[in-house]
């Protein structure tokens, strides 16, 4: 790496940016490590008060030889060992076997969300521009191929347990955007849903960390204290005057329920923000399929069943429950199924119009032997071998000792 610090006036398209003299959360850019592609980007940087930048001449253009930079910090080219954090970022942005879009979008967004929560813990609320940049990046990919990004969420669920607030925030954001699109919301409202989902648990940073970790097991005074996170989040985010009112309402009302059993204000259906209800139902689903502390995760199909029952009890509007199930499927991505043929299959996609007939990857034959090459089949379409396959029941991957993730990873190149 060969870096140089130069004045913003010396920056031109074709240079590779690695740092600026303004904190990332005070700019509208998701990342400062990027190729500068046009003059408009440079003008925006100037508008946000950036005066000095650092470029990497090994990845982009250098200054003309006749130009003397204000300060130079040349480092010898060749192999260097980057700091741990920087190395992690570079690995995450390298092509990964053709599945770069979903993997990289998710990894970049996760890194940005982690920075937001780190700043929140220091009492620094994110700018609306920084939050919107993350959401817009994810939304573009959801609009382009929701299967790939939903699969990435499923893979993360399988590979990890007891995930951090950032993991839950990002997954809730992705799934909320999918539901918002399925609900027919216009893009400005989709973005507000995504921003609210990303920040819905911001108030937890103001509560004891050990209490937050066991939040699903608390009762009494601890539970009452945890329920304050909605108001604490609004207070924290309101310190930035530009945060949209609808985003703040999502943060405040995502635990409200249509039957009045929610918190913090026990609002009824007609008083709850519809955008907050979207984030609320996704929040419940994501919590159910995530292992936290001693509480095991539900398999996705069982979580969908619980959502249906919640709709029957009046906790969520039935049309919203229907939209949620249509979005993620009766058998969500990552579900392990037993087919009527005796074969096992992993769900790799959903059919919104035929929710009982997902896209699957058939992994074992009727005798339980593994197929050398799994069969990718749309259960809603006629089979080439004229075999009629239907879902017999849902299996628990843990009990079956099946690593579902290894069957999901290879679909990313195809889906992306």
Can you annotate each of these PLM segments?
Residues 1-120, 297-416:
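Terminal helices and disordered tails flanking the catalytic cores of nucleotide-processing hydrolases
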Residues 8, 14, 31-33, 152-155, ...:
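Generic secondary-structure boundary/loop-capping signal
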Residues 34-35, 183, 216, 241, ...:
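Helix-turn-helix-type domain boundary/helix-start signal
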Residues 43, 128, 268-269:
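Short, flexible, glycine/charge-rich loop motifs used to bind or transfer phosphoryl groups or to couple energy/partner
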Residues 63-64, 198, 215, 255:
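Short secondary-structure boundary/hinge segments and terminal tails
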Residues 79-227, 234-246:
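Acidic/His-rich, divalent-metal-binding segments that scaffold phosphate/diphosphate chemistry
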Residues 172, 195-206, 221-235, 239-321, ...:
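Alpha-helical scaffolding flanking metal-ion-dependent phosphate/phosphodiester catalytic sites
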């Amino acid at each position: 790496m060969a870096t140089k610090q130069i004045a913003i006036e010396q920056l031109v398209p074709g240079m590779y940016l690695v740092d600026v003299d303004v904190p990332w959360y005070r700019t509208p850019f998701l990342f400062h490590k990027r190729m500068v592609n046009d003059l408009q980007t440079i003008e925006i940087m100037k508008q946000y008060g950036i005066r000095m930048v650092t470029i990497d001449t090994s990845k982009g253009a250098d200054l003309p030889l006749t130009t003397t930079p204000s300060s130079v910090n040349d480092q010898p080219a060749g192999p260097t060992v980057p700091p741990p954090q920087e190395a992690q970022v570079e690995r995450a942005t390298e092509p990964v076997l053709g599945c770069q879009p979903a993997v990289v979008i998710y990894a970049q967004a996760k890194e940005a969300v982690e920075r937001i929560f780190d700043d929140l813990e220091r009492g620094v609320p994110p700018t609306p521009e920084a939050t919107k940049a993350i959401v817009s990046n994810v939304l573009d990919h959801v609009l382009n191929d929701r299967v790939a990004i939903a699969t990435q969420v499923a893979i993360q669920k399988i590979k990890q347990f007891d995930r951090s607030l950032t993991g839950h925030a990002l997954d809730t954001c992705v799934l909320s955007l999918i539901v918002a699109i399925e609900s027919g919301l216009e893009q400005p409202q989709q973005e507000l849903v995504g921003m609210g989902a990303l920040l819905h648990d911001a108030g937890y940073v103001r509560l004891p960390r050990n209490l937050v970790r066991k939040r699903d097991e608390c009762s009494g005074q601890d539970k009452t204290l945890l329920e304050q996170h909605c108001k604490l989040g609004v207070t924290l985010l309101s310190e930035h005057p530009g945060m949209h009112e609808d985003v703040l309402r999502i943060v405040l009302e995502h635990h409200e329920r249509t039957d009045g059993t929610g918190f913090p204000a026990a609002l009824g259906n007609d008083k709850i923000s519809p955008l907050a209800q979207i984030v609320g139902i996704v929040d419940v689903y994501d919590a159910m399929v995530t292992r936290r502390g001693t509480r095991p995760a539900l398999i996705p199909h069982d979580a969908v069943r619980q959502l249906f029952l919640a709709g029957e009890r009046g906790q969520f509007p039935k049309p919203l429950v229907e939209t949620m199930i249509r979005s993620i499927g009766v058998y969500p991505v990552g579900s392990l199924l037993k087919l009527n043929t005796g074969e096992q299959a992993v769900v790799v996609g959903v059919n919104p119009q035929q929710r009982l007939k997902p896209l699957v990857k058939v992994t074992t034959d009727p005798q339980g032997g593994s197929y050398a090459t799994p069969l990718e089949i749309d259960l809603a379409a006629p089979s080439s071998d004229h075999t009629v396959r239907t879902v017999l029941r849902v299996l628990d991957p843990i009990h079956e000792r099946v690593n579902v993730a290894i069957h999901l990873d290879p679909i990313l190149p195809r889906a992306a």
